[in-house]
A protein has these predicted regions:
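Feature marks short, highly hydrophobic, charge-poor N-terminal signal-anchor/signal peptide-like helices
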Residues: 1-10
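Exposed aromatic-hydrophobic patches
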Residues: 312-313
Length: 359
């Protein structure tokens, strides 16, 4: 009887453990607790202390949601444009129906870094239409014009579709389809190289046992597309590039400076373990650089002593990298005081020369 009692206790403990793992995959106290336990030995590896984070304020959208993620910034003279998406994940449907890009603007005062952003229009720039949801907007300049790319996820004849809109006279043009794939093709990142506009997109897969809940994901490759005309109405596939690093790219942003391609990205590190030996699959903030745009070296340490990092974006000024990043709702107690589901945007700065890269 004693053995049976012990076995029942073990079984009960195992059931409770599985339940906690399942519940901790969603925003809440258990996820916050799991993040704290998993990352306590790894957050200290970052370069910048999280006390240096300036938290940004965004106006409510028309539905009253302040849960902001997927930021993309464009510095235009003394103005900063930001496109970001509400992401109220605590809603019953996960909030995907609200994940549509909105335009915000901040006025840059002297050399101050902007942290307050006002809605330009209280309506989304585009709607999901036939897709399951919109995601991953990216703002950029091309031939003195302002454009927005948005990724549509899961349509009737595609897994990912990239649409393009031009911002003219405070109005957005009707979207046109420029890229369509049956791959993940996540988070388009734009680089202008002479007469070519390169679009980098990330392909990753969830690991086994519903890995995004418990184990994580793996970056399979990054695909590159190029424009075929100046009007940006036609793009062609260029190549896949391998990603052999332990830091797995999830969302990112790119820029070119002084002969190097730079990729700022959030991602887990498969070499990171918890103190009890399990993989730490929470995401940190990284940067990689490349001379040819194909072979990248990744920084040795995360840029900031904080896990729970989501989509980053940045601008470079006087070799100071000004980084904006969304949180991934894993800081339940702290971030939810400000934003319902814990998705908000922070900012910090780091000198580009202070970052060391792996060989």
């Amino acid at each position: 009887m004693q053995i049976v009692g012990i076995l029942l206790l073990v079984l009960l403990f195992f059931i409770v453990f599985l339940y906690c793992v399942y519940k901790s995959s969603k925003p809440g106290v258990l996820k916050n607790l799991r993040r704290g336990v998993n990352t306590m030995t790894n957050e200290r590896k970052g370069l910048i202390d999280k006390s240096n984070i300036r938290w940004c304020t965004f106006e409510l959208d028309i539905q009253g949601h302040k849960d902001i993620t997927h930021p993309s910034i464009l510095l235009d003279n003394h103005n900063m444009l930001v496109v970001a998406t509400p992401y109220p994940q605590l809603l019953e449907d996960g909030g995907v129906s609200f994940e549509n890009p909105y335009l915000f603007k901040a006025v840059m005062k002297d050399n101050q870094v902007a942290t307050r952003f006002n809605l330009v229009d209280n309506n989304p720039i585009c709607l999901p239409e036939e897709a399951h949801y919109n995601s991953d907007p990216v703002l950029f300049k091309w031939k003195d014009k302002t454009y927005l790319m948005t990724r549509k996820q899961e349509g009737p004849d595609y897994l990912s579709k990239i649409i393009l809109q031009e911002y003219v006279g405070d109005k957005w043009s009707e979207p046109i389809d420029i890229i369509k794939t049956d791959r993940m093709s996540a988070c388009p990142m734009v680089i202008q190289m002479g007469d070519k506009l390169k679009v980098y997109m990330i392909n990753y897969r969830w690991n086994s046992f519903k890995g995004h809940k418990t184990i994580g994901y793996t970056t399979e490759n990054i695909e590159i597309w190029e424009n075929e005309n100046d009007e940006l109405t036609s793009f062609k596939f260029d190549r896949f590039i391998n990603w052999p690093h332990t830091q797995q790219v999830y969302h990112g942003d790119m820029f070119y400076h002084d002969g190097y391609y730079y990729m700022l990205f959030n991602g887990l590190d498969t070499s990171y373990r918890t103190f009890y030996g399990v993989h730490d699959h929470f995401k940190y903030l990284w940067i990689a650089k490349s001379k040819d745009g194909v072979h990248f070296s990744v920084c040795k340490n995360p840029l900031i002593k904080r896990s729970g990092i989501y989509k980053p974006t940045s601008y470079l000024k006087d070799r100071i990298l000004n980084v904006y990043f969304a949180t991934d709702n894993s800081y339940f107690g702290t971030d939810r005081k400000h934003y319902r589901s814990g998705n908000r945007i922070g900012q910090f700065s780091i000198t580009l020369d202070s970052i060391q890269y792996e060989k």
